[in-house]
């Protein structure tokens, strides 16, 4: 008999129903559950799949470069980055006739094109790329890396090149190599690129392989490095009148601490960024030599952890047993990695707009909005994944004997206190924030806006003042003009910072008021509730008072029969499922807030946000409705416009989102009956009945239907907001 899908599970392959396909897809990546899996094969499969992942990433970025070089307008855009719209790629087959062709022919193109809102043009321009040839070269290089990754993945599955489990579990060596190699050497290499290619390009000097060895990045060469006069590299920076990409007003410094932004590009100084990467490189190169490997010097992580026993015994046996627990659990390691990556991704969102690193990106408002929203959503999914794998760790990998009375065991011991405190915080935030919003709504409805409860965020304003924002008049730390820190800041460190923070044209430390106070607490409610659901899901994954033997049922189970007073919806998977809705909800509020505040800032009518954001009707009317009006008006008697495609996507996003509810709100029996009816009709319809299927159609399980519903809900939600965000921003700022 031919092997049927899924090959990794003979039990499933013999299932006569369509369950075989669904369960096969669901468990394809759950290597631990596959037939004949050993620990060694598990690690090797994961290792090989990393190479595949890298190949996909390199291929994707190569495609970006290739399509812009082929169909974009990079060389034209460089001449006037503020007024030429960057083209992502051509549209091969514009539907809806001539009006559509005209609507989408822009950015100086000959035919219909898509505009790039990803910031790649600004990025490539900043790092020194200048011609289409440069882009093609980059695309080919990444294609080569992609092929190399695929070969690497294949190679490490061959018997001779398969790494052993002991190699995968050598934590010290891995940490050393990742710190020194991944972070240290790559940061050093990037500093090299900035100093040798990007900074000269910003000063009008075109450095490529043919003249790479002849052009000195600094007039004094390596002299100052070897004589210890490092300050020479910071002397004579670019002036405030410097025109980016030309020698006009340029200096010779390569490593500076100017602070603030380049006046023309509104982005961080390239020489500051080179300095930053050099510092990071040195830090990580040192960090990558700290752990004990073959040479018997340096720290052993196990010894470090075992030594962590707090005085007074208040945390029991401290970190004893943690080393082996983490080192032997892939889920624990993945959970830690995802938690770190999630935080970093959210920080990227925050810093890309407040401290823009790429030339002219701060003036490309749609790109700013798209990048912020994109990174916040990605961060949300990654963070929920961290807790999901934390829960799987507790179910599959946690060994109570190994962790007796250490910090991990103690988390489980007092989980009720943790969960109840989080619950209390969520309830407090929710009722108080909603109470304030609703009170203000009622006051406006009754025509007495002066009776609103408006709370100034004085603590946040104080923190902003401490960093140098003077408009609140707090006169503290860096905003105190006669303090030593303020005076030192003018000359020794970051002289540009104080002028940047008090400029009103950037997004640094935006002025905040009562509307910000309220939405901040709404977001805090979302964060705490999402965390509550995720933490409870993980801490109760092994068992709860209602169901002490939960871990025997695995990560996801629908119900445990009618006993125990009802055990539906209490698996660790159900917690993850519920948390994703709250995560999307929270990031919705975050992105609404960011977008509305910035739209009013860019349009120069900040009072609209300040006055309308203190009550819910203001958000619904002056943000959502006002900004979606162009989208709801996509097709009208005047024909197509360039927003029509977003209007269609806005509708389509709502459709996908609403389809989610068909799977989320249902009961099981009627699905099966519906399927039987459809199958019956199919078999009795001429022509259609020529097509037969081998598997008996069965309805999705409860858990599967929830997953399908969740996927539609999430995708539709994000599609809808993406269309709204891009159309409302690009419609205003061209």
From Swiss-Prot:
Catalytic activity: reduced [plastocyanin] + hnu + oxidized [2Fe-2S]-[ferredoxin] = oxidized [plastocyanin] + reduced [2Fe-2S]-[ferredoxin]
Broadest EC class assigned to this enzyme: oxidoreductase
Extent of the signal sequence: none
An example Gene Ontology molecular-function term: electron transfer activity
Binding site for [4Fe-4S] cluster: 559, 568
Binding residue positions for phylloquinone: 671
Mode of membrane association: Multi-pass membrane protein
InterPro entries xrefs: PSI_PsaA/B (IPR001280), PSI_PsaA/B_CS (IPR020586), PSI_PsaA/B_sf (IPR036408), PSI_PsaB (IPR006244)
Record-annotated membrane-spanning stretches: 46-69, 135-158, 175-199, 273-291, 330-353, 369-395, 417-439, 517-535, 575-596, 643-665, 707-727
GO cellular component: chloroplast thylakoid membrane; photosystem I
Gene Ontology BP term (one): photosynthesis
Subunit structure: The PsaA/B heterodimer binds the P700 chlorophyll special pair and subsequent electron acceptors. PSI consists of a core antenna complex that captures photons, and an electron transfer chain that converts photonic excitation into a charge separation. The eukaryotic PSI reaction center is composed of at least 11 subunits.
Family that this chain belongs to: Belongs to the PsaA/PsaB family.
Protein name: Photosystem I P700 chlorophyll a apoprotein A2
Organism: Lobularia maritima
């Amino acid at each position: 008999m031919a092997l049927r899908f899924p090959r990794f599970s003979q039990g499933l392959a013999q299932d006569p129903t369509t369950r075989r396909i669904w369960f096969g897809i669901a468990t394809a990546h759950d290597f631990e559950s596959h037939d004949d899996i050993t620990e060694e094969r598990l690690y090797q499969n994961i290792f090989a799949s990393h190479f595949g992942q890298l190949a996909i990433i390199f291929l994707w970025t190569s495609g970006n470069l290739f399509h812009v070089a082929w169909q974009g307008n990079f060389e034209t855009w460089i001449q006037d980055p503020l007024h030429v719209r960057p083209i992502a790629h051509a549209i091969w087959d514009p539907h809806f006739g001539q009006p559509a062709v005209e609507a989408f022919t822009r950015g100086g193109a000959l035919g219909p094109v898509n505009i790039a809102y990803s910031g790649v043009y600004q990025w490539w321009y900043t790092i020194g790329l200048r011609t289409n040839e440069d882009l093609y070269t980059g695309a080919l290089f990444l294609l080569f890396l992609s092929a190399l990754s695929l070969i690497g993945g294949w190679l490490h599955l061959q018997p001779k090149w398969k790494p052993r489990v002991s190699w995968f579990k050598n934590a010290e060596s891995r940490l050393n190599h990742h710190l020194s190699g991944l972070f240290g050497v790559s940061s050093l290499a990037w500093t090299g690129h900035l100093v040798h290619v990007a900074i000269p390009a910003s000063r009008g000097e075109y450095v490529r392989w043919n003249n790479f060895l002849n052009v000195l990045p600094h007039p004094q060469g390596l002299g100052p490095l070897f004589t210890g006069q490092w300050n020479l590299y910071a002397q004579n920076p670019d002036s405030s009148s410097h025109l980016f990409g030309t020698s006009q007003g340029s200096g010779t410094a390569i490593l500076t601490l100017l602070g603030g932004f380049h006046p023309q590009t509104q982005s961080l100084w390239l020489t500051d960024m080179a300095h930053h990467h050099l510092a990071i490189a040195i830090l990580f190169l040192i960090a990558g030599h700290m752990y004990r490997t073959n040479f018997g010097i340096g720290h052993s992580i196990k010894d470090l952890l075992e030594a962590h026993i707090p005085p007074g015994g208040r945390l029991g046996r401290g970190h004893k047993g943690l080393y082996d627990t983490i080192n032997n659990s892939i889920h624990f390691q993945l959970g830690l990695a995802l938690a770190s990556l999630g935080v970093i991704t959210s920080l990227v969102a925050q810093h890309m707009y407040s401290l823009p690193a790429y030339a002219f990106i701060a003036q490309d408002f749609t790109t700013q909005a798209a990048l912020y929203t994109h990174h916040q959503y990605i961060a949300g999914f990654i963070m929920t994944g961290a807790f999901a794998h934390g829960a799987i760790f507790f179910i599959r990998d946690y060994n109570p004997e190994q962790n007796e009375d250490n910090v991990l065991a103690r988390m489980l011991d007092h989980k009720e206190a943790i969960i109840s405190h989080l619950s209390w915080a969520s309830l407090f935030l929710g009722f108080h924030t909603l109470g304030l919003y609703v009170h203000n709504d009622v006051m406006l409805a009754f025509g007495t806006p002066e009776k609103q409860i408006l709370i100034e965020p004085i603590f946040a304003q104080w923190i902003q003042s401490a960093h140098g924002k003077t408009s609140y008049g707090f006169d503290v730390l860096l905003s105190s003009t006669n303090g030593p820190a303020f005076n030192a800041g003018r000359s020794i460190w970051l002289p540009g910072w104080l002028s940047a923070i008090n400029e009103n044209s950037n997004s640094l430390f935006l002025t905040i008021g009562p509307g910000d106070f309220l939405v901040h607490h709404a977001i805090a409610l979302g964060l705490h509730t999402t965390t509550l659901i995720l933490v409870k899901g993980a801490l109760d994954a092994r068992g709860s008072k209602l169901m002490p033997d939960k871990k025997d049922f695995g990560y996801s189970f629908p119900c445990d029969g009618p006993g125990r007073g009802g055990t539906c919806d209490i698996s660790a998977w159900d917690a993850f499922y519920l948390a994703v809705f709250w995560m999307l909800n929270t990031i919705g509020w975050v992105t609404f807030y960011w977008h509305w505040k910035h739209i009013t800032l860019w349009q120069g009518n900040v009072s609209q946000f300040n006055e309308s954001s203190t009550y819910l009707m203001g958000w619904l009317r002056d943000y959502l409705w006002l900004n979606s009006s162009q989208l709801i008006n996509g097709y009208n008697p005047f024909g197509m416009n360039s927003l029509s495609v977003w209007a269609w996507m806005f509708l389509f996003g709502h459709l996908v989102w609403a389809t989610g509810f068909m799977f989320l709100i249902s009961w099981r029996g009627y699905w099966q009956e519906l399927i039987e009816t459809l199958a019956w009709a199919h078999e009795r319809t001429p022509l259609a009945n020529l097509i037969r299927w081998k598997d008996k159609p069965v309805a999705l399980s409860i858990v599967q239907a929830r997953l399908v519903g969740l996927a539609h809900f999430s995708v539709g939600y994000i599609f809808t907001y993406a269309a709204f965000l891009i159309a409302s921003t690009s419609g205003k700022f061209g």
